[in-house]
A protein has these predicted regions:
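An N-terminal assembly and electron-transfer interface module characteristic of large anaerobic redox
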Residues: 1-424
C-alpha cells in the first residue's frame, strides 16, 4: 500500500499555447510522442498551425531522418497560404540519441526557404544535461526570431516576458508606466501579427514576470541590448514597493531623456514621478483593505494551504500570507521548479512548524492531520485534502502587483461564501 498515490484529475483548464504570430509548428517525432501535442492543438483550436512528421525505427536506422525533414518543410511551405514568417521545429527526446546538428539543419532550411525563419526547440525530458529546463528553453526560443533594432528606432516601450496571460489592463503597473511616459507594455501573448511581435525588439526595457522569462531576457540583453529586471509573482506589499522603486530607477533615465527631447524640462519629469507614486499609494491601500476583508472572512479557520498549482512561487506566497496574519499550515510542493529556493529556506528556518509536502501518496495525506475546514490555495491541495474552501488560482495568472494582492484576497473572501463539493 506504500506505493498508492492519488491521481489528481485535470478539470479541463485550457493550457495556453504560446506561438509567434504568422508562424507554423512542425513536430518531428515518433507517432506516440506527438500525441499530447496533437491533442492540445485540437483543444486550443491551433490545429491549423501545427504539422507532424513522424518517424519509424526503420527511418532512423536507415538514416532517412534529415531528408524527411527537408521534404516535410517543403511540403508544409508549399501547402500553407500565406507562407509562414517563422517555422518552429520541435524535436523530441529521440533526437538526443540521434545527435542531429540542429544549427546546421536550421541553416540548410533557411537557405532552402529564404523568406522564412526556422527555429529549433527540444522537448527532451530524458536529456542528461539537467541544467536545462524544457519549458524555459522553449519559452526562450519564442524570442529568437527578433532582430536587432538601431538605437534611433527604439521607443519607450517595456516588454513583459515569461507570462502566459497578459498583465490585466486594470493593473497599476500599466498606469505607473504610462505616468512615467512609457505608454506601451508589450507582451508576446498579446501579439496578433508578426509586425507586433517584431516590435518587441524596439522596447527599451524587459520585465521577466516569471522564471520562464529569465533566459529569454538574458538572450535579448545579449542579442538586442535590452536591459531587464526579474519580477516573479509577489504578494508582499513591502517587496512590491522595493521592486517598483527599482523599476522607477531603471526607467528614470529614459523618462528624463524623453522629456528633455520633448523640450519640457525636468519639472515635467518630476510631475510624472509624483503622479506615478500617487498611483502606487492608492493601489497599495486597496490591497491592504482587501487583505483585511479576507482575514475577517477566514476568521478562526486553522489553516491556509498553498500549492505549486496555485503559484509558481509557493514559498514566497506562504511567507506573504504569514506576514499578513494568516495561519499557514502547509505548502504542497508537488511540482516545485526550484525557482523559489530562498523563500523555501527562510520558511523552513523561521517556521519549522509548517509542513512541506513533496509527494501525494496516501501516507503523506494521512499524516498531515489537516481538517477539511481549511482554505486550500491551489487545486492539487484542495483535491487531496477535500478542502471546504478553495479560491480559483492557477500559476499566479492574472495576479500582478498590488492589484494581484487585491484580487487574491477578494477571491479568498469570496470562496468562504460556499463549500466545495467533492465526488466520492
Amino acid at each position: 500500500m506504500s506505493q498508492l498515490s492519488y491521481q489528481i484529475p485535470d478539470n479541463g483548464r485550457k493550457k495556453t499555447l504560446l506561438r509567434i504570430p504568422e508562424s507554423h509548428t512542425l513536430y518531428l517525432c515518433p507517432g506516440s510522442c506527438g500525441r499530447r501535442q496533437g491533442i492540445r492543438a485540437l483543444k486550443n483550436d491551433e490545429a491549423d498551425h501545427a504539422s507532424f512528421l513522424t518517424f519509424s525505427q526503420a527511418d532512423i536506422a536507415l538514416g532517412d531522418y534529415i531528408g524527411m525533414v527537408h521534404d516535410a518543410a517543403d511540403e508544409v511551405l508549399d501547402a500553407i497560404e500565406p507562407t509562414p514568417r517563422v517555422v518552429t521545429l520541435y524535436v523530441n527526446c529521440i533526437d538526443d540519441f540521434i545527435g542531429t546538428d540542429g544549427a546546421a539543419l536550421v541553416e540548410e532550411l533557411g537557405a532552402r526557404h529564404p523568406g522564412t525563419r526556422f527555429l529549433l526547440s527540444h522537448i527532451n525530458p530524458v536529456a542528461a544535461d539537467v541544467r536545462g529546463n524544457v519549458a524555459v528553453d522553449i519559452h526562450t526560443n519564442h524570442y529568437a526570431a527578433l532582430e536587432p533594432v538601431p538605437c534611433e528606432e527604439r521607443d519607450a516601450g517595456v516588454n513583459a516576458v515569461g507570462g502566459f496571460v497578459s498583465v490585466p489592463d486594470s493593473c497599476e503597473l500599466r498606469g505607473y508606466l504610462e505616468a512615467l511616459g512609457t505608454p506601451v507594455l508589450r507582451e508576446l501573448v498579446a501579439c496578433t501579427t508578426f509586425d507586433e511581435y517584431s516590435a518587441l525588439a524596439r522596447s527599451r526595457f524587459n520585465i521577466a514576470v516569471s522564471h520562464l522569462g529569465q533566459d529569454a531576457c538574458r538572450m535579448m540583453e545579449r542579442r538586442l541590448g535590452i536591459p531587464w529586471m526579474y519580477w516573479p509573482a509577489c504578494y508582499d506589499p513591502d517587496e512590491l514597493a522595493r521592486r517598483y522603486e527599482m523599476l522607477g530607477l531603471a526607467l528614470s533615465v529614459l523618462l528624463f531623456d524623453n522629456v528633455t527631447d520633448e523640450g519640457a524640462g525636468t519639472s515635467t519629469a518630476a510631475l510624472r514621478l509624483d503622479a506615478a507614486e500617487n498611483l502606487l499609494r492608492e493601489a497599495r491601500v486597496r490591497a491592504t483593505e482587501a487583505t483585511a476583508r479576507a482575514l475577517a472572512a477566514v476568521g478562526e479557520l486553522p489553516v491556509v494551504v498553498v500549492d505549486t498549482c496555485a503559484s509558481l512561487m509557493p514559498f514566497s506566497l506562504a511567507l506573504a500570507l504569514i506576514k499578513a496574519g494568516f495561519n499557514v499550515a502547509a505548502v504542497f510542493a508537488l511540482h516545485s521548479k526550484g525557482n523559489d529556493t530562498e523563500a523555501e529556506e527562510e520558511l523552513t528556518r523561521e517556521h519549522p512548524e509548517i509542513v512541506v509536502v513533496r509527494k501525494q501518496g496516501l501516507e503523506a495525506m494521512a499524516e498531515l492531520g489537516i481538517p477539511h475546514t481549511c482554505v486550500a490555495l491551489g487545486r492539487d491541495a484542495a483535491f487531496l485534502l477535500r478542502a471546504n474552501h478553495s479560491p480559483d488560482m492557477y500559476h499566479d495568472e492574472g495576479l500582478f502587483g498590488y492589484e494581484g494582492i487585491e484580487k487574491l484576497m477578494d477571491s479568498i473572501a469570496a470562496c468562504m461564501e460556499h463549500t466545495e463539493r467533492w465526488d466520492a
